[in-house]
Amino acid sequence: MDFEKELEALIFNMRGENEVYFDSFCDSVMLTDYECENGIWTGALQKALNEHSTIIIPSGEYTLDGSIIIPSGRKIIANDGAIIRLAQGVKVLMMKNSNTVDGTHFPIVNHERNEGIYIQGGTWVDWCEHRMGYGKSGMSDSERSLYGISTMMLFECVDRLVLRDMVFRNCGGFAIQLGEIKNAVIEDIRFESCFADGVHINGNVENIYVGRISGEVGDDLVAFNMFDWQDSSINFGPCKNVICENLTLSKSSHYKALRIETGIYTFDDGSVVDCALNNAIFRKIRGIKTFKLYCQTPVYFPDNGPERAGVGSGDNILFEDIEIDLDSPIDLLDEYLTSHPIKGTIAGFELGTNIGNLYLRNIDITLHRDSYPLSYLACIGPKSVRFENGGEVFDPYLSSRVENLHLENIRINGDAPSDITPYIKEIVFDRLYDDIPSTGCGKIENIFYK
């Protein structure tokens, strides 16, 4: 595949250029050269960042009682044994770059960007014992002026970002949230007793490497949510040129999915953006049972109708070297638990995006059709679940299409099937409900299997 070789070369060169750029930083200072106040290091760390390009945090424990604002051209190196924690009850995030902006109401145009932020090492600790919920931890500021932020660290409108060799612990919101990023490396990150997404990536991202991510989280280990709910988004837009590899989700993590959410988003001024994914490789992934590649609006009631949204697009997307044990539905809802004949399909790859070329290579999946007969390697098409209060979870009116599905070295329950079609499902809804549009379908035009 030409796109695969070109993408590998592009990301390799990006990583090298980033290393050369950050290696040129020579002005450094120890954080302990500054004085803390009553055991709080917020002011000292902020002052050090304002005055020097490289801050070294020695081994020890450091408490912050507010947010650190990182300007352009900065490196933070936390030595082994450095533990940086938020003080008990602090509701704002720990760190963000200086040029963040709300990109959910209007497209981001000509906004000043940061260039060059690098953080390496350290254990970064929140005070939470469970997921706190939006507006209760990880806020952008005390006024929650950026509504869709709930994270330990936020990086947006940044060119050249490197986060590596970091441990996150007890995060009540996302550990890392990104959007409007170009030329980023996120690698060697571990999560310990975190309660939401590990790495949460929103839109307008170009040239990103995510690798060697592991640990325990309460939601997605890594999420590429170019289209997402308002309370989880810093912006909306496409993502291109992605390598995401070597992910290991701990067995103790209860939600074993990886969301890759596309969609058509409408801004307040009526302009629209395709939150698309193009040129992406996801490989060497363990512990995930379902990859979700579709548009999902928030829960709505038929009388009100769903948010304005449409099916997003993608092209040249590869999943490779992945092991899946689909021992139960990822969403423990009645339709899936009871294998509803129309709405009960589950799959390792659940598709609801208009995709040009999708590649599945070296996939080893175990299906448990004795318990869940509507289990598949991949499915495409609409989804629908109704709560008891009448709320609709998905979008049964959306149709989607894959032009070319390329399958290579697929193993189902340990065997390589001669015929793959029994493991691929095109979902069709035909006037499923009377109260909302509910005639959607999924279609795969061509399947190439070897």
Task: Give the ranges of each region predicted by the language model.
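Extracellular/periplasmic carbohydrate-active domains that bind, remodel
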Residues: 1-450
